[in-house]
Amino acid sequence: MAIRKLLLLLKPIDPYPFLQTEGASLIKNPQVLQYLESRCKVHKNAIKFCQEILSKKPVEWKPISRNDLSHPIRDVDMVITVGGDGTLLHASHFIDDSVPVLGVNSDPTQAHEVEELSDQFDASRSTGHLCAATVENFEQVLDDILFGRVVPAKVSRISLKLNSETLLSHALNDILIAQPCPAAVSRFSFKIKNKDGASSPKTVNCRSSGLRICTAAGSTAAMQSAGGFVMPMLSRDLQFMVREPISPGSTASLMHSTFKPDQFMDVNWYSDHGTIYIDGCQVQHSVQLGDTIEISSDAPVLNVFLSHGISQIRSRY
């Protein structure tokens, strides 16, 4: 398919508005302020650069702030996000499997900066795990796409049903089901079932701080930080982990595992209240005592241009 019409989705140009308020005076370390101001400047310059490159290409495009995005994205051939993984995650909730997306990391972490400032504060910037481009290679990556030298990867997302009703939001990274108060105990049970009707032999009853399920793309995020393992990016499996289980006993080995595309997880919620957090704070749904939640990889895939695929294609030229 020829790509002629693009949407440029932007992280807010001023991502740190508090720098313009009196609150900024509470930051005593001047290097912190310089670092934050630098991040704003680098991001603004990246937006300007991407717009200049697009203006030279035979495409129609328009920019929009991610804060102004409120409806499904249609009638475009591709979405380009400029920001970090959070901006691409935000975009994913408005994109189905018909529109590919390219992420541009506008402010990548600088290893030398992190090292120089490590004794003062964390100077990490944007990881950009899902972003295939930066300012350094944006034009080359864009040309690879426009000339059809690279195709997007089909990345799995999580489908959710709440009391048998399908939720419209699909998680690209992960979901967390937990109490609204992080200090409260979550009570629930789950069972892995096959879509042909068979189920695992054991229902797992849990008291814990919640249940996290991730896709392959999300396995490098919170799941890995919690002790999970990194999955191949194109895997359709889902990984789950019960967070901080209380006295799991004989079910300890069942608290962290995976399930296949021909399976789903059936969760029964036994606390008074709960929340399904989809891709961090992107989307939330409330649950209550007695609710059932069905989790699977049945959601439409997201077509994402990944750096690995682009580097493979480029090595042929």
UniProtKB/Swiss-Prot annotation:
It is an enzyme of class 2 (transferase). GO terms for biological process: NAD metabolic process; NADP biosynthetic process. Pfam families: NAD_kinase (PF01513). Homodimer. Its main location: cytoplasm. Optimum pH is 7.9 at 25 degrees Celsius. It comes from Arabidopsis thaliana. It is found in: Cytoplasm. Keywords: ATP-binding, Cytoplasm, Kinase, NAD, NADP, Nucleotide-binding, Transferase. This is NADH kinase. Two-fold decrease in activity in the presence of PPi, iodoacetate or para-chloromercuribenzoate. InterPro entries: ATP-NAD_kinase_N, ATP-NAD_kinase_PpnK-typ_C, NAD/diacylglycerol_kinase_sf, NADK. The keyword Flavoprotein does not apply. Belongs to the NAD kinase family. Phosphorylates specifically NADH. Can phosphorylate NAD with a 100-fold decrease in efficiency compared to NADH. Prefers ATP as nucleoside triphosphate substrate. Can also utilize UTP, GTP and CTP. Key source of the cellular reductant NADPH which is an important antioxidant factor.
